[in-house]
């Protein structure tokens, strides 16, 4: 070989990876001295991170993760610590900061640093530990393993060499987590001498000897259980340690061997000697501290320090050294080492005497020839915090030898401030068979200066070299120096064989074609169709050249990649084409084999690509699946490299490429298509990673194509295996079949028999299961869950429940405890094992218990701790609730009792006053109500037969005032509220029947009308539907003007007086006499026989003769009454439209206060001033009307003005009645309060009779015989109109219903239920017009003219007839029916508002109701009713006909639907003189004188004794009244209700029906009202009493 070729300056610069060094104090200069210059590269400082850039010829490397010696032998100049820096904090250090405190200069101190590995899965390998300052030292650490969840200790030694505070960093280089930095600090101080001056310390150096062996004495090795051990410790210090000492010169092969005899006191003599010696080594630390020559001495000293941290006592007896030359002097004294973990003890000192210089040995190694000498010079100026390399001083000089072996000596010049130890020198793996390291026999102590380190020898001959590799040097600082080395051969001269062979091969010529010579290569990088065309063309050219050169035997290549010179005379050897090609992959036939990898996980492996030529090379790396024609590429590779085409997967995408770590500032060349572009400079190496991510289970094999412009194509094989984690628990696989059984035999539960209940011991069953990893992957179980709960749930608990790891084919036992609650004999739960890869393995826990042992063992199982408290709280709260209910019930009952007592006291007080017979004594602020009460007292016993709902009549004034303060609707209703009972009387002849009150004076019609309204308040009790019912008939001379006048306001009535006089047939007093001397007495049905006798006595006192007409008079009805009504109704409707009806009703409503105001004085005067003898005289009535005082008139005017506001509201309140309550209310008996209202209405009717009927003869029976077909048409019309009117009512509040206080009457229909008054509103059929004849309170039959028709517009509270055409007027029937007005048109408005005249509740009586005539009076016609279309109503048919259970309230707008002319009062009224004066005391001359010839309508003899007709669902129990009336709400206004049905049949006698209107002041929903009447009267309990006990409601509250 002619010599070495030096690369051009700056042509082959290489960069290295970064090194993490904080506060570094080293600067490494690796110089390679060559003729022509030197190359190097500087280190750039970074805060806390120091990057080390590798130089071409010399660089500093630190071992990184997974870098073994083989890894470092790879020619990778990119391997730097920046690849692994700060990957993650994988170690925890304790203490967090290491502080040594104050230490004397030159005196070492030690402390332990503990490193913990928190990972539960992987272990951590510590490759090396080094420091950044010369004051801190760590004994050599090489590949120390820290197990998972384990710890390791490192001894850090602090040797201060300068004063002051010293802070530095300790660097721990790990295999998996990079480099960690750890802060250390200390303070150095000088030792003060006895003279008081500080000692001057020369430069000190820290040396660590190697302990070679430790031996026991022969006797102790054979003796056991000894307490003392004699140990011989042999350690060596390399001879080159003394080379720094100027006075010491040792041979190159000499070493300083020391032997220490140590006696150790053993604490535990039972241990083996080997264990004791190992413990001694672990706790014994030996260091050397060498010092330079001092000013006073030429000798250098090496002090020996020993640290013992164990518990045993150590006695150092002797120390010997074995040096071949007597150059060392030893000073030693035996010492007993104390136990300490920090301070060293100085035990010996060595002094090195003067010797020869070191330069002579070096000069002897130099060669005499002029070939370049090889020197190694390292300079290291310390710069705090970072490294810096001076390129001008970092040089390597390689000396060539003349011998064929080719040996090169490596020289090293160190400029460090302190010495370093060179531990090892090695070369990369690929060059082991080429290069050999010589002259290196172990660790070298390298003080500052220039030293011959080792030699390199080329082990091959006769080949052309083109080699680029590294030489690696390891030091005690933890740093590894990589020296780049390029070795290649060249012809010694032109024309030599080697040069010619290389030129004829033409490899460099071909490989040099890149961008300029072959531009198509760059276009083929797009991986389109042209890619394969380009690769195929270049590959064919290269192959043809190889065949050409091969046939000429010009050049051959071996498997090592180096050409061997051969002569043509030698035999030809067959070599493959691949051996001829220079490979970009250093390792031929390289296959990256990935171990088993879990799905969705990735594994990475790296390989190296290099450029073996001095020309740049461009590479494109890509998986085979991304190549345009992968099958063609595989065929080419099979042809060149012998690849197995069957095993290669052409389409797999599980392999991807990644660049290992791009250089800082250099952009990544990875393309978006998954290919990797790499540009390699001459001799450059790059590291490329392959990522394997399995997509399915199983093995997959593919190729990584390496397209290049050097050999066209190259490849790397890849192989991976997709695996899954698989566990077995208890020998069962997870899933449906993974059932882990807990079979509990009966013998296990026998303790339930012997166990006491008080002990409450918990039975549990424990079973162990083996968890096996049967898969190829390691598994880490992170959690165990039972039905979603960690470690325990539903009685199961996993003991020692913490994460654990399982390697493949390993197992572990887990214990599961089951605590049954003995509620079920079969318990099934799910055990889930969750791994670190988020995989879940499900197993079934199946427990079977003996079912017959469950009840016995369940008693032993203790309940939850909160169970007893829960039940106590439950019982406590239930008790409180029960107590509260009892208290509330007690208070309510007490309130009910108090209300009952109040009501009873009021009733008793009123009853006592009524029994005295003085009606004036009961007059209260409401005279008409008091009069109603007096009337009850007259005809009733002391308790008045009231049942459950009998309330006091007189309301309190406060209630009236409160009612007036309500809303306008309530106020309008609270103005007038009346209650009426209905009474039935039998006709008896009386002397007072001849008295006549017929006043026909035309000038007093208006006065009579006004006074009649006042008198009606007193007479209403006997007015509305009393027992003295009279017949109604229509006059034949009806005209429409009269009816219109009655419907108009008062001023209209005054204007039409003349027309009324001309139209109405007047009755003269002479003509108002009856043909028969029959007098009709009105008795309520509640009265007994004693009352009837009193009436008989009154009858004898009445002088009025009575005559009974035996022939019914002809009817005077018009021929066509339906046409008249149909024509009249629209006319009135047009006159009184929606806007005109309100004033009319308001004016009509104004009559009501007049009645209320005038009732009291008139009642008093009539009662006191009239005698029984003059009751029939009409002159007695006239002055009573004239006695009205002015104050009474003023009250009349005020009440007219005050009551108008309630009219409009009542007008718009139609009400529906619930049909279920209708029958019950229809069958309820009349009440005393209703009788009072009847009396009020009586006077009104008499007043109207006196005005309109003056001058006419009242002849009885004139209107029954006049029945005609036109009359029947009229009757049918009325029946139709009633059906049409049924749709007029709507729902309203209970105040508009026909029952009082929430329908006390309606409550009788159901036992103990609430009143249905509010729902009764839905039951009212439409009866727009109801005309009635209010019976007089003692008016004789002579008051009614027998020949004249009495026109009357009746109020709303009289039951209307269903069929008007069947109203009988004569009393030929055994018991005449009750008179009523037919239902008329629904559009007409009446005179009285709903608050004025309160209608009564209808009561249907039995058909057997008879009206006997006492004393044989001829008042009863013996002829049966032969006229079917009579004017009497069949009331029993009304009750049970078309609407048997429906109320029929009378509307305000229905009063004037029928003309008053058509109404004839043919029945006689009771002519009691005392009572008659109440009706006619102060009114105008009455026209109520009935002719003597008028037949009596109520002449049946069985009036009192006949049982009542009670049809409905009323309860007969007295308790029904209690439950039905206790909570009766107070209603405001109640409408009249009457069941309406067409009269289909007409019996020989008439059935009676009564309507009652109850009165209540107002409804207060927040107060309970109790209406009770306990039956205490014996008379009321009599079996002959006609009505039931709950039918005599009276009074209000």
From Swiss-Prot:
Residue stretches of biased makeup (Low complexity): 907-917, 1223-1239, 1291-1319
GO biological process: negative regulation of canonical Wnt signaling pathway; negative regulation of immature T cell proliferation in thymus; Wnt signaling pathway
Signal peptide: 1-40
Biased composition (Basic and acidic residues): 1269-1290
Extracellular side: 41-869
Spans annotated as Required for Wnt-signaling inhibition and LRP6 degradation: 696-916
Pfam families hit by this protein: Ig_TMEM131L_2nd, Ig_TMEM131L_3, Ig_TMEM131L_4, Ig_TMEM131L_5, TMEM131_like_N
Glycosylation site positions: 343, 593, 709, 846
Transmembrane segments: 870-890
Region annotation Disordered: where it falls in the sequence: 907-928, 1096-1240, 1252-1322
Membrane topology qualifier: Single-pass type I membrane protein
GO cellular component terms, semicolon-separated: cytoplasm; endoplasmic reticulum; plasma membrane
Superkingdom of origin organism: Eukaryota
Stretches of the chain found on the membrane's Cytoplasmic side: 891-1597
Biased composition (Basic residues): 1213-1222
InterPro entries registered for this protein in UniProt: Ig-like_fold, Ig_TMEM131L_3, Ig_TMEM131L_4, Ig_TMEM131L_5, TMEM131-like, TMEM131-like_Ig_dom2, TMEM131-like_N
Localization per Swiss-Prot or TrEMBL: Cell membrane; Endoplasmic reticulum; Cytoplasm
Nucleotide-binding is among the record's keywords: no
Keywords for this protein: Cell membrane, Cytoplasm, Endoplasmic reticulum, Glycoprotein, Membrane, Signal, Transmembrane, Transmembrane helix, Wnt signaling pathway
Gene3D superfamilies referenced in this protein's UniProt entry, alphabetically: Immunoglobulins
PANTHER family from the UniProt entry: RW1 PROTEIN HOMOLOG, TRANSMEMBRANE PROTEIN 131-LIKE
Role noted for this protein: In its membrane-associated form, antagonizes canonical Wnt signaling by triggering lysosome-dependent degradation of Wnt-activated LRP6. Regulates thymocyte proliferation.
Family that this chain belongs to: Belongs to the TMEM131 family.
The protein's name in its UniProt record: Transmembrane protein 131-like
Upper classification of the organism: Eukaryota, Metazoa, Chordata, Craniata, Vertebrata
Gene field: Tmem131l
